[in-house]
Amino acid sequence: AFAYRDCTPYDGTFLIYKEMFAVLLYRLTRSYWKKQHICLVCEKFSSMAQDNGYYFFKHCMEKNEQSYLNKKILYIIDRKSPDYPKVSPYSKNVVPFMSLRHMCSLLAADLIVSSDSKYHAYATQCRHSIFNRYIKKKKSVFLQHGVTALKRVDSIYGKGNRSACDLFIVTNTMEEKIILDNFGYEPAEVANTGFARWDVLKDCSQDSHNILIMPTWRNWLDSVSDETFEDSTYFRNYMLLLNSGHFNEILEKHDLQIYFYLHAKFQSHLKTFHAASNRIHVLSFDDTPVNEMLMKCRMLITDYSSVCWDMLYQNKPTLFYQFDLDQYNEAHGSYIDMRKDLFGDRAETSAELFDYIEEAAEHDFALKPVYARQRSEYFQFKDQQHSRQICVAIKRRFC
């Protein structure tokens, strides 16, 4: 069988020669690089500054955590990223992706801190890269980009796998137990600190009438044609929802606005989604950062997305629309029983979902007491000092 992927700017012989030159340059200047005690920070494919990596880096720059950790903290990001201006205030500590400085910094790094696996600190999808062998030996901190509970990922991030880490950051006591029971890590390798992005997470929805609909992806629909996608239960259910006359009546009655945000893996199919109502807005991945939408909305409607935890942190409700739970469990798996352990009302049909939306609107989108109790049980702290706690955990583990 053959595996295919899109060609990248880093394919070809030029990169091979550049890597060889970087390795030679590093070896000639090793003493200079090593005394800096470099810690690299990045996000997915080193292409963003929106998630836990960025907020951790921002905190470290503004609170002088470099002195506390005795490390030179550098953020890796592609110059072409739309988020590049966000890191410009810290330009001395920003390293352009795949530059010579990036390559030498990576060779010298003591630690990689990332919201994804450490391999996102480099263009390692180019399998011929000699840098794969160097990255494999690097110590790493996995900040995560979502709470681990609703989808099984131990085959990817479990200890002993390629994307394993040396310190696994978690957000609550339930998640900590999931990691210890299923991923093979020791207690000293797991830190319950909360997410760095939660430092800036606050409820900005007081005067809002917005509901965010944010479904996650399905592995059985990954990279399929538009025709196959449009024939799926996933597409049909969301199109029926977005174009329901009854749904529009509810929106009119309670003066609500809907923002439909498709998962990044399905953005190529975004053009196939549309809604008749001017109260429903279909957003692209680049329109607004997820963090901002979660802060501005009154309620979240999702299926299995871990952003529901960001809503719970803000004391705001989530409705779970799970029309394909059995198929999802078979394909992705879960660490909890979603029929009884969720912290929000669960609907399998659009009729059930509409009833829950009306009920939530009539109660001013207050979190139900039963879910408020779960919130108080899950979170160790909600003090917006999560990046500080991550620094403490890093120092305890590595310094």
Predicted regions, residues:
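Conserved catalytic-core segment of nucleotide-activated headgroup transferases in glycan assembly
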Residues: Q50-F57, A191, A196-T272, A347-T349, ...
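Donor nucleotide-activated moiety binding/catalytic core segment of transferases
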Residues: V95-S105, A264-W309
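A short, gly/pro- and small-residue-rich
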Residues: Q125-G146, F229-L240, N315-Q327
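Catalytic binding pocket for nucleotide-activated donors in carbohydrate/polymer assembly enzymes
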Residues: P187, F273-A275, S306-Y378
